[in-house]
């Protein structure tokens, strides 16, 4: 039983899990790209540029989910002083920052043909940029503070403050007049996105989730 918790056995399991996820990732990636680039139709208004959505939207979802996880785990770590939680948040933060940047960049590329500009001080775009700064500050704190307790306290405060930004990003399209359209996918209501576009969107989301899992396990 004790061997199960031994570091060498844990790393052995992680290696096996990485190989397993890796094989699924490449198969699902091929399927997702086929649906996104071949089977999915162009939008009747946006044309082929709508295909950027299949990376942009999942990246935005993951960036929001990652920061939410960091905030919750940081609070738990601050209260209960669980070292593993600190390691988890430090591993998630660069992943979340990467996907936030992907969401912002792909959104800018998509915005040019759709809105006629790469950047606008739209409520959602601005709040996403603010979240990227929160990610960056969180990473820098753990990078340059030698004292774990001090780093945990400051990073927990940053994470909690940053958590306030999450509902602003989510509901900005409903609270203010923005360039972004209201949500097309709703958990509790009726989604307005057609299944021919929803399918590749969800497939790409699962592909990126697997990619996140691979990076996390490797770190």
Positions of predicted regions on the chain:
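Polytopic transmembrane helical bundles with strong interfacial aromatic enrichment
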Residues: 2-219
């Amino acid at each position: 039983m004790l061997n199960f918790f031994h570091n060498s056995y844990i790393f052995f399991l992680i290696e096996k899990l990485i190989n397993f996820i890796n094989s699924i990732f490449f198969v699902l990636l091929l399927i997702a790209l086929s649906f996104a680039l071949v089977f999915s139709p162009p939008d009747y208004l946006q044309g082929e540029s709508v295909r950027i959505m299949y990376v942009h939207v999942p990246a935005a979802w993951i960036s929001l989910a990652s920061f939410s996880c960091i905030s919750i785990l940081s609070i738990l770590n601050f209260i209960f002083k669980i070292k593993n939680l600190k390691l988890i948040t430090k591993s998630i933060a660069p992943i979340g920052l990467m996907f936030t940047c992907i969401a912002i960049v792909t959104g800018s590329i998509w915005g040019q043909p759709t809105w006629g500009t790469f950047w606008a001080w739209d409520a959602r775009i601005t709040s996403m940029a603010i979240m990227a700064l929160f990610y960056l500050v969180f990473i820098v704190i753990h990078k340059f503070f030698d004292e774990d307790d001090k780093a945990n306290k400051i990073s927990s405060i940053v994470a909690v403050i940053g958590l306030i930004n999450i509902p602003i990003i989510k509901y900005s399209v409903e609270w203010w007049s923005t360039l972004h359209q209201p949500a097309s996918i709703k958990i509790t209501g009726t989604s307005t996105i057609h299944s021919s576009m929803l399918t590749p969107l969800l497939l790409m989301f699962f592909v990126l989730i697997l990619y996140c899992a691979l990076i996390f396990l490797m770190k």
